[in-house]
Amino acid sequence: AAAKAAGAEYCVLTTRHHDGFALWPSEYGDFSTKNYLDGRDLVGEYVEACRKNGIKVGFYYSPPDWRWNRERMSFSYGDTPPLGIDHESITLPEYTAEEQQRIDDEFNEYVRGQVTELLTRYGKIDIIWFDGRLPQKENTISADEIREYQPGILINPRGLGYGDFRTPECRFPEKTFAPEWWELCFVYSDGAWGYLNHECYKPNGWLLAELSKTRAWDGNFLPNVGPDGNGEMPHTYYQRMAEIADWMKHSGESVKGTKGGIWPERCNVPVTRNDSAWYIHIDWVCDDEITVTDVDKPKQLIYLRTGEEISFEYENRSIIFTFPENSKTILTDVVKVIW
């Protein structure tokens, strides 16, 4: 409910990460809620909560599985000698070609089985978000097969090497992917994708600035939050979501149902647009004079948070103004341009 109030249109749950633990009672493997938590289906509970709040359902799934391969892989980094799961020195086993093929086929069937469960147990699923290459790509499961189970589903490109949308991570791209669909995923807490025993989150001024830039380039923004061992979100998360919800009440129209297209070529700050207005996004650290070039003279500029009119100059087909210092907040301030 907190995410919905803050403007979330879809969520993506980590159904299984690289550690290999599946959050549903899977018939494949021995490391899921079938063997733990008395068979509780956490994925099903998530799906129910999404539908209750009118949020589209996304599943993250990691094809790589460190637990499955723990006796056959190194947990070291870079070019260092092989290390075991406890970072002890190990010698990796060697297999014949036939043995390796058997291992690969078993793992492939395991991944295929789990992905198929996710696609067939929970009704309509809107997004499948693979984090890593499927072990045998189309021979694991193809895009056509996925869509046979889930017509209309969106597939990210990390599993098959191609998909419906790009997924840059933790760094804003140097150039837009538009007209291709894309989504920027980012760590919202300060330090990790998973749960941390502190409540340090990036400020909402940062989050709204990233959202504004992403929407100005026709992308979606997917911030990550890790719950604790009981599935509870940290208190700070709810505070931040409430603050974003308040912002959405006055400025949500600037990021909902809008498109981009003119930043940075014709404006020095992000701009979103719809058929009736343009929206100029001024982030929490911007002190610059704002210039929008190659436009007709507007009727007025309105500060969405307060409704006050913003004075501006118009010359050489350019809008020029400075956002009032006494109106600035620590979030993104949005000025609506009306013609």
Identify the meaning behind each predicted range.
Residues A1-W339:
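Mature catalytic domains of secreted/periplasmic carbohydrate-active enzymes
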